[in-house]
């Protein structure tokens, strides 16, 4: 069995990082059986080897593979921009009903709490 090396693929994709990313994507597609037209001798090889061989032979469209990778990494849902600025201000105003106790930053409510230290003994914070 002939060994495929990165130097064989560098003629098609000169950047090694890009080669690894695209070969990985193509190997995953082969593994998920997206492409089922395997040649008989390729059935014995693992998907990464098949992917590297096909990239080195020029049988894979690099541009199509890049576009497929980009599409797979995109988010599926689009976030709609806030149309009206007044709506965001109205949301902020809805929280004005909270008393100051919940908004404070002094953490005084922890002073009378009982905590357990690393030895399993209880102690109070106001001692």
UniProtKB/Swiss-Prot annotation:
Keywords: DNA-directed RNA polymerase, Nucleotidyltransferase, Transcription, Transferase. GO terms for biological process: DNA-templated transcription. Coiled coil: none annotated. Belongs to the RNA polymerase subunit omega family. Promotes RNA polymerase assembly. Latches the N- and C-terminal regions of the beta' subunit thereby facilitating its interaction with the beta and alpha subunits. HAMAP family: RNApol_bact_RpoZ. This is DNA-directed RNA polymerase subunit omega. It comes from Rickettsia rickettsii (strain Sheila Smith).
